[in-house]
From Swiss-Prot:
Pfam families the UniProt entry points to: Trp_syntA
Record has DNA-binding as a keyword: no
CDD domains in UniProt: Tryptophan_synthase_alpha
Entry protein name: Tryptophan synthase alpha chain
Catalytic activity: (1S,2R)-1-C-(indol-3-yl)glycerol 3-phosphate + L-serine = D-glyceraldehyde 3-phosphate + L-tryptophan + H2O
Pathway in which the depicted protein is active: Amino-acid biosynthesis; L-tryptophan biosynthesis; L-tryptophan from chorismate: step 5/5
Top enzyme category: lyase
Top-rank taxon: Bacteria
Keyword set includes Amino-acid biosynthesis: yes
Organism: Thermotoga maritima (strain ATCC 43589 / DSM 3109 / JCM 10099 / NBRC 100826 / MSB8)
Keyword annotations from UniProtKB, A to Z: Amino-acid biosynthesis, Aromatic amino acid biosynthesis, Lyase, Tryptophan biosynthesis
EC number assigned by the record: 4.2.1.20
InterPro entries listed in its UniProt record: Aldolase_TIM, RibuloseP-bd_barrel, Trp_synthase_alpha_AS, Trp_synthase_suA
Length: 239
């Protein structure tokens, strides 16, 4: 099995359910989980994930509360924090304190959707930041990736916001990017079926699935969500 990263929005429908999901996913042997930090203006996300952000914010979920929850669990997969830039740089106790806490928790990297690759070097964040590549990313920008320290590269397989798609465009471009970079390449944005996962695995190192899992969380009673999410991940993995 190649790589598989699940996106789980923290605090949707509440942090206790998030904790149960993270523990339940541990049995599946996946590569990692992106923990989504809620934000009031999630410009890169589609309506399904935007709803999760708004519910979590109404629940009073903050990065600090997310870190407290993460400190209570132990998992075998890699953890990543996906957050817009504002909550990171405006962490109440200071950005350095946040980065120190992330390091203690073993979080492998930050995923910051509103931080373009060319701007990463201008932001004073001493932590591995996952770079984004899109179908319209220029070759000279792609080549910059080889000079950054990151756990993987996040390929956005569709223009615009996140959400489920029926097709897998840009396969040729994904292959070209894979040839140019040294880091593992994970493809996300729009993957919701095992057939799509298999197609990505043929040309990249792994997939990232978000909206398809958040939709499961949205459509099921709270006490059934962890089990239903695990079932969906198993389906995506072809288990």
């Amino acid at each position: 099995m190649k790589g598989f990263i699940a996106y789980i929005p923290a605090g949707f429908p509440d942090l206790e359910t998030t904790r149960k999901i993270l523990i339940a996913l541990n049995e599946l042997g996946i590569t990692g989980v992106e923990i989504g930090v809620p934000f009031s203006d999630p410009v890169a996300d589609g309506p399904v994930i935007q709803l999760a952000h708004s519910v979590a914010l109404r629940n009073g979920v903050t990065i600090k509360k997310i870190l407290e929850m993460l400190s209570e669990i132990s998992v075998d997969y890699d953890l990543y924090l996906m957050s817009y830039l504002n909550p990171i740089v405006n962490y109440p106790e200071g950005k350095e304190k946040l980065l120190d806490e992330l390091k203690k928790l073993g979080v492998k990297g930050l995923i910051i959707p509103d931080l373009p690759l060319r701007e990463v070097k201008n932001v004073d964040i001493a932590y591995p930041i996952v770079p984004f590549v899109a179908p319209n990313t220029k070759d000279e920008e792609i080549d910059l990736i080889n000079s950054v320290q990151a756990p993987f590269v996040y390929y956005i397989s569709r223009y615009g916001v996140t959400g489920e798609r029926e097709d897998l465009p840009f396969a040729d471009h994904i292959k070209r990017v894979k040839e140019r970079i040294k880091l593992p390449l994970f493809v996300g944005f729009g993957i919701s079926r095992h057939e799509q996962v298999k197609k990505v695995w043929e040309i990249a190192d792994g997939v990232i699935v978000g909206s398809a899992l958040v939709r499961i969380m949205e459509e099921n009673p709270k006490d059934e969500i962890p089990r239903k999410v695990v079932e969906k991940v198993k389906e995506l993995l072809g288990k």
